[in-house]
UniProtKB/Swiss-Prot annotation:
Organism: Homo sapiens (Human)
Source domain of life: Eukaryota
GO molecular function, one term: 1-phosphatidylinositol 4-kinase activity
Protein name per its UniProtKB record: Phosphatidylinositol 4-kinase type 2-beta
Stretches the record annotates as Disordered: 1-82
GO cellular component: cytosol; early endosome membrane; endoplasmic reticulum membrane; endosome; Golgi membrane; membrane; plasma membrane; trans-Golgi network
Name of the gene: PI4K2B
Protein residues bound to ATP: 133, 148, 257-260, 271-272, 344
Region feature (Important for interaction with membranes): 161-174, 264-272, 357-366
Family indicated by similarity: Belongs to the PI3/PI4-kinase family. Type II PI4K subfamily.
Amino acid sequence: MEDPSEPDRLASADGGSPEEEEDGEREPLLPRIAWAHPRRGAPGSAVRLLDAAGEEGEAGDEELPLPPGDVGVSRSSSAELDRSRPAVSVTIGTSEMNAFLDDPEFADIMLRAEQAIEVGIFPERISQGSSGSYFVKDPKRKIIGVFKPKSEEPYGQLNPKWTKYVHKVCCPCCFGRGCLIPNQGYLSEAGAYLVDNKLHLSIVPKTKVVWLVSETFNYNAIDRAKSRGKKYALEKVPKVGRKFHRIGLPPKIGSFQLFVEGYKEAEYWLRKFEADPLPENIRKQFQSQFERLVILDYIIRNTDRGNDNWLVRYEKQKCEKEIDHKESKWIDDEEFLIKIAAIDNGLAFPFKHPDEWRAYPFHWAWLPQAKVPFSEEIRNLILPYISDMNFVQDLCEDLYELFKTDKGFDKATFESQMSVMRGQILNLTQALRDGKSPFQLVQIPCVIVERSQGGSQGRIVHLSNSFTQTVNCRKPFFSSW
C-alpha cells in the first residue's frame, strides 16, 4: 500500500499569491471558507438524526452505512474570539484550527500550550521512541501533554530519528507493518481514546487531533527557507509581506495526549509486585485495571503493546490517604489506589489481521494476570455495550467521523478496519460470556465480520442487516500462538 500523502500539504481553499500555493504544509479540511460554518460535532462525534433514521435506511448508501457529514470548524471559546491578533503573525495562531466547543477544559489546555509557544516556551522532543514526539508545556513550563505530529511518525518522511531509516535500508523486507495504514498513527491515538471513552474504560488519557507549530518540530530545509524569506519580506517590504497567507513555519497536525503524572512503566512495577505481592484489595483493583487494558488492546487490535508502553501509578504512602483530585481528574473522578494508563496507541486499527512476517502479539498475554478469568465487574460493564449491534454501529460511525478528516482517507480501507474490529468484538463477547481469561481470549481464531452487499446501509442497525463472518486462516511466518 502506498503511503498516503501528508494532510498538512493541501493548498488553501481560496486563491492566493504564488507564494501561498507553494507552501509546504496546509490545513486540509480546514480551509478559511469553512470557518464560517460551525461544526455540529467534533471529529469522532457523529451527528445522529434519529427521526430520519428510517428514511436513511431505505435510501441505502452503496459505499458505507455512514453519512458523509461535512466537518467544518468551530471556535473553542469566546475568549479566543476576544483575543486580538495582528493581520499577519510571524507564527500564525492555531487556535482557529483547535476548536473544541464540546470540551472547554481541553480547549483551555490547548490555549495554554499555544500561549507558551508564543512566548518562546517550545515543545521538547522526547528522546525515547522511534518517532518525533514532544512534551508540550504551559506558560509556567509545566508539561501538560504529548504531541505526536503526523509527519514525524515512525514511517513518516520527517521522522527525526534514524531507527526506522536504518531498518528500511538494512531490512527492507520487514520494513513497516503491512496490516496498518501508513502515517495514520495520530488517528489511531485519538481513536483509542474514543473507544476507551465509549466503553467507559477510563485508562487512556484524553487524546485529540490538534494543530501546532513550533521551531523545535522537524521541518525540511525548504519550509524553513520559506519561513525565513517571508519574515525578511515582511520586514523589508511590509506591503508585499502582508499579502502572504502565512508567515512562519506551517502548522503540523497530530495527536495531543494529556500528560499523566506519577506513573512509571509497567515493567518496573511488575518486577516489584513479584518480589512484594500486593495486598488483596489492591490486587483486585490492579486486576480490574489490567482487564480494561486487555479489552482496549483487543478491540483496537493494538500491534505494539509491550510491557514498556503502558504505565502504572501506585504509591504506597497514598494508600491510606485520598488521592489528589487533580491527578485523578482524567478518570472521571473515580479514585483508585493503583491505576493503569494505556499510552502509545498509534499502531492499532489494522485493515487486516497480521499475516505476513510478524504476529505482533500482546505481551500482557504472558503475565500471571492474564491467566485469571475476566471478573464479574468487567463482564457487567462491557457485555451490555458490545453485545448490542446498535452500539457497535454507533462506535463505527464515531470512528468514521474521526478518520475521514485525514486527507488520505479511503472508505473501502476504513470498512476493512471496521470489519477487523467487529470480528475482535465478536470474539471478546463470546469470551466474556464463556468466562474465559485474557490468555484464552488471544487463542481464539481471528475473524473478520464484513457487511454483506445485501445488508441494510441505514444508520440504525436492524436484525435484518446481514454480516459475513470469515475466519482468518493465514498466520504470520513468526507466530506466537
